Amino acid sequence: MNITYPPIKKEEIDTIYAFCKKLIDDYEDLGSIDYDKVLAWVKRKIEKRADEYKRVLMGGDLAGFYRFHEEDGEMEIDDLYILPEYRGMGIGTKVLEKCLYDTDKTVFFYVFTKNERAIKLYKSLGFTERKKVGDTRIIMAQSGRG
């Protein structure tokens, strides 16, 4: 499996935003948030931090995106999204393993509690639940291996 992780292209910001919006639409309790405010924040974050995002290419074809950055002395995986047609192929696992091996710091991320498939994967890779955030998300973490 030939997977590479080049930086995103500026014109992909809107695509990443659309993926993030889909995750919010699919898994967030929309009645409990200010939807427009959340989406505006997501858009600003992606635009401001675009240099921290990576493309996930499988054999040169776009399979997904993610952001890996330092946050309070730890490393956060943010906005990990694998395109539906590439799910179940081990690509998400490879991204997570790459992040773990790229650092010796603790790696963490937020995941929606309704995203049971992702949580099952994360637990199988040794991530544990650190903290519940509101009613819809949890933080999962694991020590880096770098």
Predicted regions located by residue number:
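Acetyl-CoA-dependent GNAT
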Residues: 7-79, 83-84, 98, 131-134
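Alpha-helical interaction/dimerization surfaces of two-component signaling modules
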Residues: 19-23, 102, 121, 125
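Conserved acetyl-CoA pyrophosphate-binding loop and the N-cap/start of the following alpha-helix
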Residues: 86, 90-98
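Conserved beta-strand-loop-alpha-helix junction that forms the acyl-donor binding cleft
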Residues: 108-119, 135-145
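Active-site acidic-Proline motif in GNAT/NAT acetyltransferases
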Residues: 83-85, 89, 113-114
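Conserved active-site alpha-helix within GNAT-family acetyltransferase domains
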Residues: 93, 114-131
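Conserved N-terminal entry element of GNAT/NAT acetyltransferase domains
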Residues: 1-14, 144-146
